[in-house]
Amino acid sequence: MSGAIFTSLEGPGALDGTSGHPLVCPLCHAQYERPCLLDCFHEFCAGCLRGRAADGRLACPLCQHQTVVKGPSGLPPVDRLLQFLVDSSGDGTEVVRCANCDLECGKQDAETTYFCNTCGQPLCARCRDETHRARMFARHDIVALGQRSRDVLQKCTLHAEPYVLFSTDKKSLLCIRCFRDMQGESRVHCVDLESAYVQGCERLQQAVLEVKALQTATREAIELLQAMVEEVRRSAAEEEAAIQALFSSMQDKLSERKALLLQAVQSLANKAEFLDLGYELMERLQGIVTRPHRLRPAQSSKITSDHRAEFARCLEPLLLLGPRRAAGAGGGTSTLTGGLGPKVLRGPGCPSPVGKMLGSPVQKPTLHRSISTKVLLAEGDASPFTEHCRHYEDSYRRLQAEMQNLKDQVQELHRDLTKHHSLIKAEIMGDILHKALQVDAQIASEYASVEGLRAVFQEIWEDSYQRVANEQEIYEAQLHDLLQLKQENAYLTTITKQITPYIRSIAKVKERLEPRFQVPVDEPSDHPQNTHDDGVNAEAPARVSTLKPAMEKEVS
């Protein structure tokens, strides 16, 4: 309960080792003394919380929830409910003396010690029977000492009258005088103590049931989370075992393949095989040597990768990032983009010269923007941006017409001034300047309105950008799949071309060894060719026995 205890409880699990008694402080492990209730409904002794507040906020030692505290003490108010429970459950050794015989009676003997409310004095059991047996004491109000301590709160502190009613509106006990002082509409909410007690018990029972249901649901959720943690651990162990098994099997397969390759390399060929295939091997080696080879590396040793851009591109869908349009602002000038060039809004204190205004007419919308807007409006899609474009075109045409009107008037004045060397219509100069200021204010208002829609359109554009990014990713994956199929087909074609000579050779030898596979000869003109083939193939049986083991190795 000392203010020097500042050991932090690491989460709710720290309560497992402490006492689960509801009247014991989780910090000092002693009975509450002036318990204080925090906003997170955790309670601690006032002494345990003293000195923990910082900047008007008090962090809960259990869950770190911030509670706003007021006053110089830096402590929340004392919890009257828990304080009552602590006082009611106390087993103190308060000693009272009998007013007649001075017999000491402890508070634990409150049920066998009495108190006379009429006399205002405590009495032991023997003196109660001896002194208050007479008829003159028959009207004295004698109650047990414990009952007297509980009856102290049964009288109004304002009027010293016993409580008879309870206000369900203000949640307070009322005596008869408090009831009389209340307004008429407030008396409707007053009920007798017995009815209020029954209603309070029912509501308390309902609240207890709700808390028990919450405890049950919380316990089930904790069990579910624990089961899920066990499943995650078991799944991780199974995945690790699967990876280890796959790695071991891969090592075994690679070892077997290594042994087979080494055996094939280390096998010796006989002289016939060497004479039959050696020169072909030499020709291949000579061809390999004569082919151009790049003996120097074409790349440098420095590794450069666009990993930052790749990371940024991967994080864009998660952080809802998209192409941002930078809005430039400087001084008192605002730049409007979307025309042939920047349009500058100047304040009333800096009017543009007449010559510059005549030399820089109001720029009309670009052909690209006009055509794009017309196409967008012609599509008929109902979207916020379409409605904005439709409203913008109307406002822009109106402002453009006003600017053209002012331009014509100023050009006419300028023409009169240059021709006649005098200002013919001086009275309309003020009107033109006033209208120009009004148009300037309208343009600024329209610009602010359009600029205010940036956040709405930016969110819509970000969604569209995410969809386009997903489509691009799918498109690139499709191209990659097609390239992979093309590469596999190239490998297949190469392998087929490599094994074609061997298959044809085996087929010819098989035709010579098995006459039933031979094609019947119908035309006599083929006999000379067949005679030549017999001479060529006469040596085939002798070569088959020599080539067959080598070809089997090659095919395998």
Curated annotation (Swiss-Prot):
One of the record's GO cellular component terms: perinuclear region of cytoplasm
Paired cysteines (S-S): none
Annotated protein name in UniProt: RING finger protein 207
Compartment annotation: Cytoplasm
Main location: cytoplasm
Keywords on record: Coiled coil, Cytoplasm, Metal-binding, Zinc, Zinc-finger
Function: Plays a role in cardiac repolarization possibly by stabilizing membrane expression of the potassium channel KCNH2/HERG, or by assisting its synthesis, folding or export from the endoplasmic reticulum, in a heat shock protein-dependent manner.
RING-type zinc finger segments: 25-64
